[in-house]
Amino acid sequence: MRATVILVLWLSALAVSAAQTRSVFPGTLDQHPAIDYKNATAADPASQLQRVVEGGAPLTFEGEQGYLRAVLSRLNVPVESQILVFSKTGIQHPFTGPENPRALYFNDRVVVGYIPGAPLIEMASHDPRQGVMFRTLAQDASRAAFARPDRCISCHLSSNSLDVPGILVRSMSTAADGRPMPQDGSFVIDHRAPLEQRWA
């Protein structure tokens, strides 16, 4: 009984603390000065790669895969980590589907996304201060151009990521062409999710 009371009091204190934080700082936490997501100098692996390339270091462009192998090599992301996403999700969703899945490669700090025929390589890279930073690299042999599109956080900034930019894995029903069908329900996936929710 005593343990239950202590747990309830502790959870209540957390709720009050969260409410106080929200009332002191209106807006999403990515805008908080401690994070300053859009303006602070980033120190994540993808931003470091961007600075090196923009400083003059070459990035090899190879055939249909473009910069993919060079990016994986520079970021120490193993090719063997590949997983495939068959749904039409992400900022390049028109290019993905059951016949042309998005390949994701990852290590402990970076996720690299590649879609055959798509104009961009996608990167989600962990910064020790700002959290997950989202970048793209144009598949243009004449110039390795990096960008930080705001539209990534339209999905990757929510209560599911604790109101800061973060990685989100969700399982949901899809139509035959890969279009998501959220009306049929969805599950946010992490290490606690039961196997029957990880089917999509």
Kindly label every feature range from the protein language model:
Residues 111-200:
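Sequence context surrounding c-type heme c attachment/ligation sites in exported
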Residues 16-17, 152:
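A generic alpha-helix preference that emphasizes hydrophobic side chains
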Residues 5-15:
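Bacterial N-terminal signal peptides
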Residues 92-94, 162:
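Flexible loop/turn segments at secondary-structure boundaries
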Residues 20-92, 100-111, 122, 194-199:
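Conserved small-residue
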Residues 96-98, 135:
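Short, conserved acidic/polar surface loops in the N-terminal third of protein domains
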